[in-house]
């Protein structure tokens, strides 16, 4: 979570018996004192349950992907796995926060916490969020390439993948380097510039990825066949636009807000609303935020973390795809139909690998009806019925459509024509 809120909150040095400093004067302090600790504990339990529910839902979707025999390595599975790891870290943080007699020691990083668990619980989830945003960009770019079927787009796909991979690695490197500097013995003036550079680079990357996501969504909305492709994947154009808009709005607004706040308040290290999650400072962790600050922190946490994460998981949820794409304007190349096709045979583009499978599937019908692919004669019988008698030793040929219906035949005549297969 990377949230900053402006205010004259000063960085306090841990001192025994010192009252916690708050921002906004006595009004905020009075509102914070009016909130009992049970309310803070209830909010912590609520957030922990929401994160645990997201973890369970993402875990279920990954199992459903295996059950439906989908590709194990895809944009869908990677996004679900990243959301699963992010929810697991957040659930661990909040579970430890309300487990110690109702106190909230881990929502504000303790000064004695080792570097790696400190970075893993408070810093690494933002890296997972950025990687999820990059994967969403790559997925929409893949949709555009599939719909346009352009070879020049396939050439740029490698560069696009490399670009987003390098952006994710840069985000991770900056986050990790700044966390190491802050965790060490760094002077306070250098600490401020370290936090500022980290926020400038990371939030700028968030904004750039949001802009690229906007461009991809605009291109997809202009393609008439994009909805058909998305429906074949169990999605729709409307869902794509809604989820993309929510992610763009929330992530870009958070990044812009962090940049503005950290620019106008460089003289302070900590805001009462971020609980040390933004600046990674362990030099001012002796104070405890008041109840009012924690309530606002919980509201911001729900808006900027829960909503985009749930949107992405619901968008990439596992679905049993409908193989009948005729209502969407597509016909599966492996669909079977009993009627004869003259110009629109759906199997006319089948590859050679499909021929043995198709031949095996038709052996049963050949045993029941010997008229498949044979020249035969149709003779009139009484009652307006016809009997087809194939030659016993006739050659097997390709099937041909029946060009005439029974209404065009005279019952007294004897015709020799092709017979269509009847499955």
Curated annotation (Swiss-Prot):
Source lineage: Eukaryota, Metazoa, Chordata, Craniata, Vertebrata
UniProt KW keywords: Lysosome, Membrane, Transmembrane, Transmembrane helix
Localisation per UniProt entry: Lysosome membrane
Alphabetical list of InterPro entries matching this protein: GPR137
Stretch list, region Disordered: 1-24
Stated role: Lysosomal integral membrane protein that may regulate MTORC1 complex translocation to lysosomes.
Identification of the protein by name: G protein-coupled receptor 137C
Main localization, broad class: membrane
Membrane topology of the entry: Multi-pass membrane protein
Keyword Transmembrane on entry: yes
Tagged with keyword Membrane: yes
Domain of life of the source: Eukaryota
Parts of the chain on the Cytoplasmic side: 64-77, 136-161, 215-241, 316-423
Residue ranges that the UniProt entry lists as topological domain Lumenal: 1-42, 99-114, 183-193, 263-294
Low complexity bias (residue ranges): 1-17
Membrane-spanning residues: 43-63, 78-98, 115-135, 162-182, 194-214, 242-262, 295-315
GO cellular component, one term: lysosomal membrane
């Amino acid at each position: 979570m990377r949230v900053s809120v402006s205010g004259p909150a000063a960085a306090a040095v841990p001192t025994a018996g010192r009252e916690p400093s708050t921002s906004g004067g006595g009004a905020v302090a009075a509102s914070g004192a009016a909130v009992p600790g049970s309310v803070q504990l209830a909010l912590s339990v609520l957030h922990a349950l929401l994160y645990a529910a997201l973890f369970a839902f993402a875990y279920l979707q990954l199992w459903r992907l295996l059950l439906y025999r989908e590709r194990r390595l895809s944009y869908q599975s990677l996004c679900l796995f990243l959301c699963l790891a992010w929810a697991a870290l957040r659930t661990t943080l909040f579970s430890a926060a309300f487990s110690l007699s109702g106190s909230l020691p881990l929502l504000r990083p303790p000064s004695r916490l080792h570097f790696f668990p400190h970075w893993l619980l408070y810093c690494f989830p933002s890296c997972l969020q950025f990687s999820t945003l990059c994967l969403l960009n790559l997925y929409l770019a893949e949709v555009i390439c599939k719909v346009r079927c352009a070879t020049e787009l396939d050439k740029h796909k490698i560069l696009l993948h490399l670009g987003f991979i390098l952006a994710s690695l840069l985000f991770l490197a900056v986050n990790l380097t700044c966390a190491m500097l802050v965790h060490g013995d760094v002077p306070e003036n250098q600490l401020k510039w370290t936090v500022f550079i980290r926020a400038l680079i990371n939030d700028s990357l968030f904004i750039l990825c949001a802009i690229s996501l906007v461009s991809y969504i605009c291109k997809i909305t202009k393609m008439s066949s994009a909805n058909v492709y998305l429906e074949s994947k169990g999605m729709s154009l409307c869902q794509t636009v809604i989820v993309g808009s929510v992610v763009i709005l929330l992530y870009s607004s958070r990044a812009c807000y962090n940049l503005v706040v950290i620019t106008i308040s460089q003289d302070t290290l900590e805001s009462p609303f971020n609980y040390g999650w933004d600046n990674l400072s362990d030099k001012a962790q002796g104070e405890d935020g008041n109840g009012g600050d924690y309530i606002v922190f919980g509201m911001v946490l729900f808006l900027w973390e829960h909503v985009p994460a749930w949107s992405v998981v619901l968008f990439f949820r596992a679905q049993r795809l409908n193989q009948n794409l005729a209502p969407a304007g597509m016909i599966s190349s492996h669909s079977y139909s009993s009627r004869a096709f003259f110009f629109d045979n759906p199997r006319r583009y089948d590859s050679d690998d499909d021929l043995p499978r198709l031949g095996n599937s038709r052996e049963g019908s050949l045993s029941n009806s010997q008229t498949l692919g044979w020249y035969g004669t149709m003779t009139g019988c009484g009652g307006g019925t016809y009997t087809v008698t194939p030659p016993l030793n006739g050659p097997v040929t390709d099937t041909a459509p029946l060009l005439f219906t029974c209404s065009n035949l005279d019952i007294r005549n004897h015709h020799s024509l092709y017979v269509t297969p009847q499955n």
